[in-house]
Amino acid sequence: MGHETMTPATTTLVFTYGTLKRGFSNHVLMQDLIRSGDASFKGVYQTLDKYPLVCGPYRVPFLLNKPGSGYHVNGELYAVSPRGLSRLDELEGISRGHYIRQPIRLAAAEEEEEEEGDLETEAPSSCVVEAYYAHKSYEEELWRRNRGRSFGAYTENEARGYVKRNDRPQHLSFLDHIRIFVSSPCD
């Protein structure tokens, strides 16, 4: 079955800041979406406003919707088809209260050598796009658990100790892992 060509009217721009970025464990999904024509890489971007980017259980990254706190967060921008967006929403647990998808303002970061995909259309220098934030049900506790400390980019250093979903205890839900993490003593 063929895919319709993605057009600006049929795509959603999505900002990725964690494990969906190139070089991280969930980027395989972005690669699949690019191969199937359901996503295209648009460039390296940074949030216009400062936001806290923190790690939760198993070094999973979370963007907290607290504009003005934290740093300008670095990440990657993708144009995603409706089918691709559905797959991202599933990964991020939108219907299960894991993350919420909301708008965020971005600015293009300095040019970086492109590794995959092509820039089919010129990417905007600044724009409002969608991002996956920590769900409101645990956002404040996650911020307190991190003692108000955050970082501006999810790098190999922040990802050290990351545990893939299939390697985590399977008898607990994602939200159970978060509840345990936020109630545990800080390092």
Curated annotation (Swiss-Prot):
Keywords, in A-Z order: Acyltransferase, Transferase
EC number(s) from the headed UniProt entry: 2.3.2.-
Any GO MF annotation of the entry: acyltransferase activity
PANTHER family found in the cross-reference section: GAMMA-GLUTAMYLAMINECYCLOTRANSFERASE, TROPONIN C-AKIN-1 PROTEIN
Entry keyword Lyase: no
Record keyword Transferase present: yes
Binding site residues for substrate: Y17, G18, T19, L20
Species of the source: Arabidopsis thaliana
Name of the protein: Putative gamma-glutamylcyclotransferase At3g02910
Listed Pfam families: GGACT
CDD domains noted in UniProt: GGCT_like
Role played: Putative gamma-glutamylcyclotransferase.
Top-level enzyme category: transferase
Active site: E92 (proton acceptor)
Family: Belongs to the gamma-glutamylcyclotransferase family.
